Amino acid sequence: MPHHTASAESTGTAATRLAVRLLDAWSARSRAEPAGAELPSDPGVPVLAALLYATGDPEAERSAARAVAVWARDAGRGPAHCGLYDGGLAGTLVGLRLGAGVHPGLTPVADRLRDHLVRTAPTLGHRREQVAFPDYDLIVGPSGTLLALTAGTSPTPAQLGPFADHLTGLCDADALPRLRTGQYAGHPNLGWLDGRINTGTGHGVAGVVTALTAALRRLGPAPGPASGLAPALGRATRWLVRQSFDDARSIRTWDGAGLDDAPPPGGARARQAWCYGTPGVSWALWDAADALGDRETADWAAAAFTSLAERYDERFHLFGDRPSDLLALCHGASGVLAVADAFARHAALPAAAALRARLLTHLRTRLPEVAALGATGMGLLGGAAGPLCALLTADHDAARTWLPCLGLR
């Protein structure tokens, strides 16, 4: 339901005006410097433009149309892997699909790219053991590609099948041994994860769970090629539950990797975001349990999120040296806002509604910082497009068609 209050109306207007200004600046910048810092396939600009276009404001419509036209000119250039983020073609697909609401001529282009992603999926050689992120995750792997196929459209079983089958096969045992990484020994940033199983939404089991849930909602548990979906999803959700613990602030949470039968280190866990920790993981669990008809696990996941929502501390849980760490969807306040909004809307969770209200206020007062972030990046996950999309969706009842990009709905 829209939040019909003076503050919501003014925030919607302020967010819309800022989105127009940032999209216009991005369009001018991209024309002048087509090889800028941003990857051309990131869906942030067309996703924000689609939300802006739907407001019906003439200035917003013109800004959105310009931005989508400029974005489409270079869409698909860049790394061209099949992932949803980091320049992947699944991100291009989302941008084309939602951008088609602004420029309908992009629909057949999106259809051709969708067909390419489905056709080439069996040739990618995804590992089934000793995995790395591209073999399974939401950011650059098949979990994100599957979710991208569901954004703004209704994919067929044949289109989802190659990705759902692979992810189902990775969850064929209770301990999820196939999701144990094996490619990061000696890596300067990811060495900690080598030989372990990532729990998170972006790079871990929670992201796989969101993709399997999306597939189950569309394919159903009926006998046939998708018959293994529900058992695989059940195994993955039970594994995540077993990795949880209460931190020093009495928040039910998760570390970045599974516990491997060891007790968790003591202390409070500051990283509580979409990517890691309670927000993203508890949502993945709740939505999966809801799709499976598992009320006990759904209630458990809602209680886990409530433990965070009632103790969320912006001074502790939002940290980092970059504006994106504080504001963006991946690590920052807008990602927690998007999750709280999903819980409030779909689970009718009072603590989620209260946290949503707090974070709306938090972001309303930080639109100047969002503007500064937009001067350097308009990406969806790490740039200014994400906070603006989250604000327009949670506070101004904008379309939710982009939320599969986060494993939300």
Question: Predicted segments — roles?
Answer:
Residues P2-T5, G12-R66, V70, R77-G91:
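N-terminal domain-start signal
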